């Protein structure tokens, strides 16, 4: 344990907090449980890179005035990370406070997969319910559901690619979703907007059970030039209109419109805020968006309004969502005591060819893209605003993760977490309290789309493979004789992860590898460094 101990103390004093002039938190403004409990709104963008927020990227070709305003009125975390480099792992971590690699069985049937969160597992929904909150999940779910079957003697899905009709009974109740996991109200899309089934569910019931195939509802456009990233995800059965404007063939409610999906989610969210904002009971709204994930289909208000094509237009629409939510909170007079958290589930799927074509770096300052173990896969924007308690314009550089939201909400509501609850979540309430001396965590673990793990501790980052571990080619390389078997980077000097120090700093690499194994095998990480 001697080596592990030395690694754990390697990061002492490295966390830095920089505050804009006049933005320090006053000592008499400590967060307390006395008084009215705050409402909580969590807006989770889908596939939005750190550099897509114009405030974060000095050369951004996107414009996000509402998100920038949110950051200027709250705290902006510049080293925030998702629990995984793709959708489902990240959402699991946010809702449960656990890393996704702890899930024993993982399937990939798109929106048809079985529930990944056990019924007895605590979520931020159940956590806040215990503190007297009304809770809602409105938006993209992507954590599995129990669908009914037309013929119980047959499997639900014959083909894992789900290109046509399935054995799903869309008229029956659906369980295993938000309503069974701590959310009083739900309005959800089962998975990503490019994955079947394309349908909305309200409180476990499909709103429109009249099912067609996307091929019947939308024309194909297969003669376009398909970019390399898209080519990996498309085939002759899918709808393909342009770079990023594609979705898989499959079952779809007859009334469902891909181009209207985000608007419908936002309307539901705004209606919920209006309804619950008039009540005395505090509310938690988890609002996971479908944009700017593919298909990049902004509505007519934003189509063609930016220099960045359909992707930039979709970013503008996502920014407008933030504007609409914050404006509604102010209209209702509840903005002062409402915590608004904005983030993204992973980095953007923005390949080298996109950077060359558009001159924009969605994952600004980091190597790689969505799916990768490199920082571009999981480095995300994270902004927290709470006017009643937080002074404006703070920038916090210490490492935090979406997985930490669970413990932070528990801290905020005065709840003591059990040992087997939110096993990987660290509260960053100290930051909101203005405590600049004690870091939230001294390590964080990442999971790539290919199941590769990485750990960051202090300036050092170790990846347990050679290659991106994700969408960027090559995902994984075979090691050669006397060559590295993993990757080690000093992020303090090499934020682009270009100089692999695995061989020259083998001792550090080995220690981090062992520490990673310890965290994985013991079943938790939140108490090992305390």
Please identify what each model-predicted range represents.
Residues 10-18:
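Sec-dependent N-terminal signal peptides
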């Amino acid at each position: 344990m001697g080596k592990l101990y030395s690694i754990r103390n390697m990061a002492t004093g490295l966390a830095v907090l920089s505050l804009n002039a006049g933005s320090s938190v006053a000592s008499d403004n400590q967060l307390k449980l006395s008084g009215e409990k705050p409402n909580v709104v969590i807006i989770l963008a889908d596939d939005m890179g750190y550099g897509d927020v114009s405030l974060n990227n000095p050369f951004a070709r996107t414009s996000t005035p509402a998100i920038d305003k949110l950051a200027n009125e709250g705290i902006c975390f510049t080293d925030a990370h998702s629990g995984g480099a793709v959708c489902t792992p990240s959402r699991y971590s946010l809702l449960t406070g656990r890393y996704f690699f702890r899930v024993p069985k993982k399937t990939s049937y798109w929106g048809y997969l079985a529930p990944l969160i056990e019924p007895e597992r605590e979520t931020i929904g159940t956590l806040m319910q215990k503190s007297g909150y009304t809770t809602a999940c409105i938006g993209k779910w992507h954590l599995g559901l129990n669908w009914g079957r037309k013929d119980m003697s047959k499997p639900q899905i014959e083909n894992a690619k789900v290109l046509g009709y399935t054995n799903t009974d869309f008229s029956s109740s659906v369980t295993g979703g938000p309503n069974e996991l701590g959310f009083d109200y739900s309005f959800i899309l089962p998975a990503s907007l490019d994955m079947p089934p394309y349908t909305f569910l309200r409180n476990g019931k499909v709103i429109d059970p009249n099912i067609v195939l996307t091929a019947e509802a939308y024309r194909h456009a297969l003669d376009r030039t398909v970019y390399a990233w898209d080519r990996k995800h498309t085939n002759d059965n899918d709808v393909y209109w342009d770079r990023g404007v594609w979705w898989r063939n499959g079952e779809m409610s007859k009334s469902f419109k891909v181009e209207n999906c985000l608007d419908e989610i936002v309307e539901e969210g705004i209606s919920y805020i209006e309804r619950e904002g008039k009540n005395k009971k505090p509310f938690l709204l988890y609002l996971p968006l479908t944009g700017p994930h593919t298909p990049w289909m902004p509505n007519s208000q934003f189509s063609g309004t930016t220099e960045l094509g359909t992707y930039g237009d979709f970013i503008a629409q996502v920014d407008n969502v933030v504007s609409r939510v914050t404006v509604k909170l102010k209209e209702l007079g509840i903005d002062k005591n409402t915590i608004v958290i904005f983030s993204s589930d992973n980095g953007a799927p923005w390949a080298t060819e996109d950077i060359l074509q558009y001159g924009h770096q969605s994952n600004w300052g980091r190597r790689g893209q969505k799916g990768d173990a490199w920082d571009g896969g999981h480095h995300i924007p994270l902004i927290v605003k709470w006017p009643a308690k937080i002074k404006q314009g703070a920038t916090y550089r210490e490492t935090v993760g979406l997985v930490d939201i669970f413990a932070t909400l528990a801290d905020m509501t005065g709840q003591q977490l059990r040992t087997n609850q939110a096993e990987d979540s660290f509260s960053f309430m100290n930051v909101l309290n203005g405590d600049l001396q004690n870091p939230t965590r001294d390590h964080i673990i990442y999971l790539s789309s290919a199941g590769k793990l990485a750990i960051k501790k202090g300036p050092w980052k170790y990846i347990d493979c050679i290659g991106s571990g994700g969408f960027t080619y090559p995902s994984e390389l075979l090691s050669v004789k006397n060559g590295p078997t993993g990757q080690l980077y000093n992020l303090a000097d090499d934020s682009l992860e270009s100089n692999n120090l695995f061989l020259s700093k083998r001792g550090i690499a080995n220690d981090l590898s062992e520490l990673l194994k310890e965290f994985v095998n013991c079943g938790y990480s939140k108490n090992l460094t305390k």
